């Protein structure tokens, strides 16, 4: 008689969950919340800046001032003059390494105008956008992992009509100008959930 002995060897390792940003919005879809998973390993500079903005309350009442159907939704101008001044003074951040991650539905990236020009302006992609990702500032820093229906419900009727320059909170007429776009959606506020360590069996 042969005796067969089966041994199962289990090992555990500690893994780090990706940090997330949970945002409340004015969008009248579902609970109005959007959850963004951040990718600090591939975009360390961008994620560090974005995390700092969230923790500082920059996203409070932050309008989606540029929302183009089937393309993108841009944000990043605070209606609070002191807040915007603080982050303007912080300067731009260094570009992250080029990424081959495609710009699919719900990707989060910075807007920019040249090398090392990223500051507070970001955008969300609406649908697949193969034309994005070629500029040095267009590096995905995360992706919407919950609330895609909310993201797609952001009002896009104004398209590119909002003049970004007139949203500068230093202008005396900035609030009055913004009030003229009654249907413009916005973030009510966001909170950062740091990645938690957990055990994974191998």
Model region roles, listed by residue range:
Residues 2-16:
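Cleavable N-terminal signal peptides of Sec/SRP-targeted secreted and luminal proteins
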Residues 13-202:
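Cyclophilin-like peptidyl-prolyl cis-trans isomerases
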């Amino acid at each position: 008689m042969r005796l067969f002995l089966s041994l199962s060897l289990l090992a555990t390792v500690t893994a780090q969950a990706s940090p997330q940003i949970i945002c409340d919005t004015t969008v009248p879809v579902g609970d109005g919340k959007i959850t963004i998973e951040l990718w600090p390993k591939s975009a360390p500079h961008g994620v560090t800046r974005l995390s700092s903005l969230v923790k500082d309350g920059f996203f409070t009442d932050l309008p989606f001032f540029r929302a183009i159907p089937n393309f993108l939704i841009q944000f990043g101008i605070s209606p609070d003059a002191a807040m915007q001044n603080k982050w303007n003074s912080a300067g731009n951040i260094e570009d992250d390494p080029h990424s081959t991650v495609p710009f699919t539905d719900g990707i989060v990236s910075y807007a920019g105008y040249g090398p090392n020009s990223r500051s507070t302006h970001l955008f969300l992609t609406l649908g697949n956008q193969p034309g994005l990702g070629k500029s040095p500032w267009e590096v995905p820093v995360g992706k919407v992992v919950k609330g895609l229906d909310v993201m797609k419900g952001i009002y896009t009727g104004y398209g590119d009509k909002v003049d970004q320059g007139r949203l500068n909170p230093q202008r005396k007429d900035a609030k009055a100008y913004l009030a003229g776009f009654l249907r413009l959606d916005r973030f009510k506020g966001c909170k950062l959930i740091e990645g938690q360590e957990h055990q994974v069996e191998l």
